[in-house]
Every structure is written in structure tokens, then in C-alpha cells.
Design a protein with these regions (language model features):
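Thiol/disulfide oxidoreductase modules built on the thioredoxin-like
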Residues: 106, 114-158
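Sec-dependent bacterial lipoprotein signal peptides
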Residues: 1-18
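Hydrophobic beta-strand anchors of alpha/beta hydrolase catalytic cores
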Residues: 55-56, 84, 133
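The canonical Cys-X-X-Cys-His
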Residues: 63-66, 133
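N-terminal "domain-start" segment that seeds a small globular fold
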Residues: 20-47
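Structural microenvironment flanking redox-active thiols in thiol-disulfide oxidoreductases
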Residues: 67-104, 116-121
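Active-site-proximal beta-strand/loop segments in catalytic clefts of secreted hydrolases
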Residues: 58-61, 87-90, 113-114, 148-149
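Short active-site neighborhood of thiol/selenol oxidoreductases, capturing the structured segment around
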Residues: 46-64
Length: 163
């Protein structure tokens, strides 16, 4: 019996490790999908198909400062200097979340599924207020966490420091 329990425990552990190796898929409110992969030993986050710095932008539907942050992030996304990914913390379903993204003027992918939000929140060590932006270098290492409203120049400065 002890041997059987050990085999079952080993099998469960192997499945957990195998699951950690794969890409996690997220559906964006604009209907596109993106995939990410987190390596806990290296503390790196990769976004499939992305080879440049990126920003995870955590926001909520009723946050005025979040809406004020969006134009600067839209400009960064349009410049091609960084990929911006929005994370809507209080999602209410794909249609409602797409409406929130439109209302805030968001022109970058934004995920809101509960599992995706929890996944990204856990990776960054928790979110204790919005807006929160976490800037990653092109290798997927978090380099700066900005809590609150910041000018575009703060993001540009961080991006320049990485080059």
C-alpha cells in the first residue's frame, strides 16, 4: 500500500511539472488570443511571438486613473517600442469587458478571464491598487513596477535603460 501511495504521489507530481512547462493561453477582449509561459526558477515571463520589452497593465472598470493612463500606453504600443497587455481585474464576461476596453480607449490586447487575471497577479506578486504597470525586458524579467498614474516619459525612461 505504501508503494502504491508513493507511485500515485509521483504521478501527480510529474503531471504538475509537465503542466508548468506549457504555454498558458489567454483570450483578449478584442477576440484575439495570446500565450504566455512563466518560468518560476528564472522568474521570467515569456509572451509567445514577442521579442521586445512588454508591460502588464493592471486596471479596473471604475478606475479613473486607469483611463487616464491608457493614452500613454496606446502611444507606446503604436510606437512598437513595447508590447502592452491589459489585465482587467474586475471582468464581467467577454462582451462587458470589451465594452470597458472600448470605453477606456484601449488599443492593446486586454485579458479579463478570472484564471488569466489570477495567473498574472500571482506572477507579479499581487496587485494592491490600480493602475499598476509592470515593465518587463525583452528576456521576460520584471524590471519595474509602477503603482499609480505615470507619464509616458516614465515608461520611455525604463525602456531606454534596457537598451
Amino acid at each position: 500500500m505504501k508503494f502504491l501511495n508513493l507511485k500515485v504521489a509521483a504521478a501527480v507530481f510529474a503531471l504538475l511539472l509537465a503542466g508548468c512547462d506549457g504555454w498558458k493561453h489567454h483570450l483578449s477582449s478584442d477576440g484575439t488570443s495570446l500565450a504566455s509561459k512563466f518560468d518560476p526558477s528564472e522568474r521570467t515571463l515569456k509572451i509567445e511571438g514577442n521579442d521586445k520589452p512588454f508591460v502588464l497593465f493592471f486596471y479596473t472598470s471604475g478606475c479613473g486613473a486607469c483611463k487616464a493612463q491608457v493614452p500613454a500606453l496606446n502611444e507606446l504600443q503604436a510606437s512598437g517600442d513595447a508590447l502592452i497587455i491589459g489585465i482587467l481585474g474586475d471582468g464581467k464576461g467577454l462582451e462587458a469587458d470589451a465594452a470597458v476596453a472600448r470605453e477606456k480607449g484601449i488599443k492593446f490586447p486586454s485579458v479579463s478571464g478570472a484564471n488569466s487575471v489570477k495567473y498574472f497577479e500571482t506572477i507579479v506578486g499581487g496587485i494592491f491598487g490600480t493602475p499598476t504597470s509592470v515593465i518587463y525586458d525583452k528576456n521576460g524579467k520584471a524590471v519595474k513596477k509602477l503603482i499609480g498614474l505615470y507619464p509616458k516619459s516614465a515608461f520611455e525612461t525604463q525602456l531606454k535603460l534596457m537598451n
